[in-house]
Amino acid sequence: MPALRDFRRRIKSVKSTQKICKAMKAVATAKMARAQATVVAARPYARQLHEVLGRVASAARDVQNPLLTVREPKRVCYIVITADRGLCGGFNSNILRTAVKELSKWEEFKLVAVGRKCRNFFRFRDWERDAEFIGLGENIRFEQGQQIARFVINKYIAGEYDAVYMVYSKFVNMLVQQPTVVKLLPVEPPAEEAAEKAGGEEAAAPKKATVDYIFEPSAADVLDYLLPRYVENSVYHGLIESKASEQSARMMAMDAATKNAGEMIDRLTLQMNRLRQEGITKELLDIVGGAAALE
């Protein structure tokens, strides 16, 4: 029967799609585990750098550094980090929605697009981009974050940007990815007391005794060295957090797609069996009716 052939063809097609989604889920799960391990390993360094910057800034309060210079924000730059690929649920759309909301606050802004989805989104709207960073790969390297950071640092020092923000997805857990906006430039060093409490669990620790640090060659020189590293590490951290969020979102999306495909196969199979049963019943009735007529 033509209808039965159509059902079999549809079921075969859905089963093929289900296999692809299941394989993509397995790949995303493995990649998510690696990306999550990278994020967890990088967080202690980020906390410690945050704390050290607060101590050095407290010791060098009168130091003049270009990255600390606060200007009236007339020309702001946004680094927007998305994925290169889709099939990851609302991951990309959530980040882009947050970015558009932030950009609407300013009359003039510059864009640094990280990820093919971000580049295509702004290109479609004909929004000018100062730089594009595409194809960073699955294993983010510190040098990649360093390259992006140095680009905006040079622009900021040259006076082309008055402030720099970064929009990325913060990895909370496998189920939660939070679009986040952070200010990169001008750098706002934390107060020493706040920096010491920035480590979450460490906040509940007993208060440390005041320590008088000696900086060599000087606190100003140490601060000049730390500020660019702080920005570079912040960008790198945004990249790895976004990568972990992307893989988590893709894993959940493919898991949902696999389950939906299974439900669709069950519905189509049930409809096909009902149609086949109707055909068999009709044939039996015809046979019984023919036999009765012969009698």
UniProtKB/Swiss-Prot annotation:
Keywords: ATP synthesis, Cell membrane, CF(1), Hydrogen ion transport, Ion transport, Membrane, Transport. CDD domains: F1-ATPase_gamma (cd12151). GO terms for biological process: proton motive force-driven plasma membrane ATP synthesis. It is found in: Cell membrane. It comes from the Bacteria. SUPFAM superfamilies: ATP synthase (F1-ATPase), gamma subunit (SSF52943). Transmembrane segments: none annotated. InterPro entries: ATP_synth_F1_ATPase_gsu, ATP_synth_F1_gsu, ATP_synth_F1_gsu_CS. It holds the Pfam family ATP-synt. GO terms for molecular function: ATP binding; proton-transporting ATP synthase activity, rotational mechanism. It is a peripheral membrane protein. GO terms for cellular component: plasma membrane; proton-transporting ATP synthase complex. HAMAP family: ATP_synth_gamma_bact (MF_00815). Belongs to the ATPase gamma chain family. Produces ATP from ADP in the presence of a proton gradient across the membrane. The gamma chain is believed to be important in regulating ATPase activity and the flow of protons through the CF(0) complex. F-type ATPases have 2 components, CF(1) - the catalytic core - and CF(0) - the membrane proton channel. CF(1) has five subunits: alpha(3), beta(3), gamma(1), delta(1), epsilon(1). CF(0) has three main subunits: a, b and c. This is ATP synthase gamma chain. The gene is atpG.
